[in-house]
Structures are given as C-alpha cells and as structure tokens.
C-alpha cells in the first residue's frame, strides 16, 4: 500500500507539473493569437512528437521529454540589416565565422515557415508593448496558479498553527550538534539522562495552560517561559482528560536553535543557524490547520516570492555545493535546490507517510504546487535569453533605442535582433541543461526526505 500511495503522489505531481507547463504556454498562446501572430505549434515537452492534432493553423501536441514546453511564432527573428543584404548583392560571401553561420541558419529556419499572407503577422513587427504582453503571459499564468493555490491553501485547508497540545515527549536529554546549515540531536541510549518532561510525567495529548502560574496562550509563551527558567525548578500546569494537573519539572540548560517565528531557523550575521542557551524540558507541540482570510494571500505570496528571489541569487553557489556533495559523497543540505524529479519524490513521500492525516497531505501537495509555480514565475523573468525575461528585456531595449532615435532625429535603429545573441543564448541554455542534469542526478541518488 505504501508503494501504491507513493506512486499516486508522483503521478499527481507529474500531472500538476504538466498542467502548469501547459497553462504557461497558454499564457503565451492566447495573446499571440489575439494580436494576430501566426502560431504554427503549441507543444508540451521537447524532442520527438508523441501525439499531436491540428486545429486551425496551429498544431497542438506532446513531445517525448516532459521538461518544459513552447509555442512557435513566425517572425521571431527580423531580417538581416539592409547593409548586409547589399554586401551579399555585391557578390561577397559574407562572414564565415561560426557565429555568423548560426545567425544565418536561424534566420533561414525562421523564414522557411513563412506563408503567403504572413507579412503582417510577424512577431517582430508587433509594437513593443504587445510583444511584452505575449512574453509576460506565460510567467503571469504561473503567478496566477500560485496565487490561486495559495488562496486554496489558506482559506480551504488553513495554515499550520502551533498549539499548546503536546505531540511528543523526549525520552532523554539529547546531545546537540550544530553546523552552519543544520542542527542534529543525538540518539537516546540506556545511559542517557531522562528528559525533565519524561521524569515529571508529561504525556502526549496534555495541553500546557500555564508555566509557574502564568497563563500561556501560545506555544511561544510556553517556550519563552521554559527558556527563561534556565535550570530552575518550574511548574507546568496541564489539562488532561478535562482535569488540570500541576507537574514539577527542572529544565536542563542546553544549546537551542533560535526560531524566526515562521517555522524556520533564524540566521546569524554570517548566515549560520543562530543559537542560544536556554532551558530544555523535552516536549514538542502539535500543529493544526487553521483556515485564514483571503486578505492573508498577498502577504504569503509576497513572502514566498521574497524567499524564491533570495534562493535564486544563491542558485549557482548552491548548485556548485551540491555538485561537490555528489562527488565527495557528503551529506546533502535540506535547503539545496531540487528538480522536477525531486518535487515528485517529495510528493510521493507526502502521500505515502502515515505521520499526517489526509487533509494535511492534500494541503502539503497544494503548497508544493503553489511554490513550484511561484518559482517558475520568478525564474522565467530572469533577463537572459532564451527565458521570457530575456525577450522582455530585448523589447524594452528596442523601445528605448527607438525613443531616443526619434528624440534626436536619428534613423530608426530597427527591431531588437535576438539572433545576434545566439551564442549567449546557447551558453545560457547549456548551463540550464547542465544544472538540470545535476539536480536530477542528485534527486535520484541523494534525495531530500521530509519524514
């Protein structure tokens, strides 16, 4: 049954990824057709076509490698400058450099798709703003999916809120090991000292209502009171089976990670996990999904995008560190990036675990889809070709050049020519392919696990 549930999670996430890719391309397709650009193909995946059908002038289909998608629009590349044409007309062979050959081949391939009547349906002839709308349509769809999934998560399932109910009682006082990126606790042995909570008789299911007579309205208040007590004897007041009991505990002072209040570890100035010394009792809180308001959605989306942005800035470094980990056999950081394979494995782990109920599993899957789409939104806005952000930047650059040309009375500089950046485009695309291979291999041989 566990294997079946694991497979269900992978299949569900694969469907979610495919739908996200498909809607991303719809975001490009719809405005392109509205602006009368001919779109010969709408494809999900890359490589050999597995299945396709034609409706109107567009072929819709699926390809063998489901790692993305695309729409092809005619007129992506403007013709060569007039002076180059004149140069060829004079009988010269033109540049024989590899880059020039690439440019000529790209223009030739683009020109081969032209049909009679396409003269006014070319992408590069559109006004700058319309081209920007087309290229931003895909990322905008991912943003909308992320916002909708976040709204479903907050208003439908609710977000995890820590309660005062005890979910676990430590058997012993563990040893603590803190590294730059992780914190681990030693295993209990026969020689380990029983935890203060275990010695005091605290049980799973107890609700902590007061510490040393002071009411605790939140688990943060419980933790603060225990940390403040240090190693001094304290009284925990708990509710158990409708009755209140006073339990005497003596906290043990030990190193503790500092929480950022959002379920993550706070960070020190050097980026390491921040720690402090405080009292340890040995109880862990439970969490419940508490539905929120639609007004909470913008803040959560903004927070997610902020974290995605910070993560993207350090992406090259983290991919390099992951590569070193793969080569040296070290331990993979839980904060390392993952591929679609890793996301699917995490989804399978969520559906297969018996540690959370069905509602919590569904909420985690929706959260995965939301975060994935918000990441795709931000990633596609990187201002490098062949990403959407690169095309947007090119359109903006064209608009700026033409504006200043009109302002100064100079000749129109013409449309932005992405062919001139083909070498850079291939380098960027190659880097993305290498990164994807590294992440996929890591997700297979050193997967991140949640449970």
Q: Which functions belong to the PLM regions below?
A:
Residues 4-114, 118, 372, 376-406:
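Small-residue-rich helix-interface/hinge motifs
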Residues 24, 62, 197, 205-208, ...:
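Terminal peptide-recognition signature
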Residues 34, 69, 76, 92-178, ...:
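Internal alpha-helical transmembrane segments
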Residues 79-95, 162, 335-350, 437-451:
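Hydrophobic alpha-helical transmembrane segments and immediately flanking/interface helices
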Residues 118-126, 170-174, 184, 256-377, ...:
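Functional transmembrane alpha-helices
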Residues 189-219:
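Conserved PDZ fold ligand-binding element
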Residues 203, 209-210, 221-276:
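PDZ-domain C-terminal substructure recognizer with occasional recognition of PDZ-binding tails
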Residues 421-443:
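Final/C-terminal transmembrane alpha-helix of multipass membrane proteins
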């Amino acid at each position: 049954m566990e294997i079946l549930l694991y497979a269900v999670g992978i299949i569900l996430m694969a469907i979610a990824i495919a739908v996200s890719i498909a809607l991303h391309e719809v975001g490009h397709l719809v405005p392109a057709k509205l602006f009368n650009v001919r779109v010969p193909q709408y494809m999900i995946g890359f490589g050999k076509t597995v299945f396709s059908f034609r409706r109107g002038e567009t072929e819709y289909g699926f390809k063998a490698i489901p790692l993305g998608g695309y729409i092809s629009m005619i007129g992506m590349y403007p013709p060569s400058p007039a002076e180059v044409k004149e140069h060829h007309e004079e009988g010269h062979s033109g540049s024989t450099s590899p880059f020039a050959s690439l440019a000529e081949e790209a223009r030739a391939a683009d020109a081969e798709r032209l049909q009679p009547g396409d003269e006014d349906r070319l992408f590069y002839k559109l006004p700058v703003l319309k081209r920007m709308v087309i290229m931003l349509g895909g990322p905008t769809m991912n943003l909308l999916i992320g916002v909708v999934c976040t709204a479903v998560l907050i208003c439908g399932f609710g977000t995890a809120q820590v309660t005062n109910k005890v979910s676990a009682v430590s058997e012993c006082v563990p040893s603590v090991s803190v590294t730059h990126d992780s914190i681990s606790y030693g295993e209990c042995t026969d020689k380990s000292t029983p935890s203060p909570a275990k010695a005091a008789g605290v049980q799973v299911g107890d609700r902590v209502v007061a510490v040393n007579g002071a009411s605790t309205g939140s688990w943060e208040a419980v933790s603060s009171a225990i940390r403040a007590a240090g190693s001094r004897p304290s009284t925990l007041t708990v509710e158990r089976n409708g009755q209140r009991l006073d339990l005497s505990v003596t906290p043990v002072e030990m190193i503790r990670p500092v929480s950022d209040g959002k379920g993550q570890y706070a960070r020190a100035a050097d980026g390491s996990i921040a720690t402090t010394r405080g009292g340890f009792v040995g109880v862990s809180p439970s969490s419940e999904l508490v539905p929120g308001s639609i007004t909470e959605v913008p803040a959560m989306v903004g927070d997610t995008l902020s974290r995605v942005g910070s993560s993207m800035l350090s992406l090259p470094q983290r991919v390099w560190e992951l590569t070193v980990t793969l080569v040296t056999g070290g331990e993979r950081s839980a904060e390392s990036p993952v591929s679609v394979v890793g996301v699917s494995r995490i989804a399978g782990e969520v559906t297969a675990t018996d540690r959370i109920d069905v509602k919590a599993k569904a909420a985690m899957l929706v959260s995965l889809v939301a975060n994935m789409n918000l990441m795709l939104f931000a990633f596609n806005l990187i201002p490098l070709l062949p990403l959407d952000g690169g095309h947007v930047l090119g359109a903006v650059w064209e608009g700026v050049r033409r504006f200043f040309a009109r302002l100064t009375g100079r000749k129109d500089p013409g449309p932005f020519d992405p062919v001139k950046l083909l070498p850079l485009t291939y380098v960027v695309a190659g880097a993305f392919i290498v990164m994807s291979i590294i992440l996929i291999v890591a997700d297979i041989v050193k997967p991140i696990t949640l449970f």
